[in-house]
Amino acid sequence: GLPLFVKPNASGSSFGVTKVKTREQLLPAVEAAFAESDHVLMEECIDGREISCGVMIAGGKEYLFPITELVCQSEFFDYKAKYQGFSKEITPADLDERTVEKVNAMTLAAYKKLNCRGVVRIDFIVRDGEPYFIEVNTIPGMSAHSIIPQQAAAMGMSMSELFDLIIEETSQAQP
């Protein structure tokens, strides 16, 4: 049913992502997504709070970054929200302990199941205290204003320390 999201399977910065509210918007949305990727996803639109959790395993140690809530002026965390100041990121997100525990457990499980390496960001929608997995960002932004560096700073980790961990972990031979 509608609304739903149409998005390219392999793209970044929300290029080609459309929130479809009417049947007439569906075909143009699919065409826009195919312009960015050979495969297109259609996802149920879940109303709730958009959050993101960074994670990495380095030197055998698990790093779960503080959760960030994404408060957007647009309908979702699109290009304008990400890069043109139409969003506010709140780190750490104001979530109850039970929700934080669920998100952290789901984040770590997804990281391991998908055999991720280095630092990734995993996005969720939280509705009525229940997190719904949305996607994995395997190449998250790393500018000083990006979410992962904000999360690292919130846990007392400098950009230099973060990059040292990433370089150390990703330079090791893959199993």
Describe the residue ranges of each PLM region.
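Phosphate-binding site of ATP-dependent enzymes
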Residues: 21-102, 126, 132
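ATP-grasp fold ATP-binding core
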Residues: 1-15, 38-47
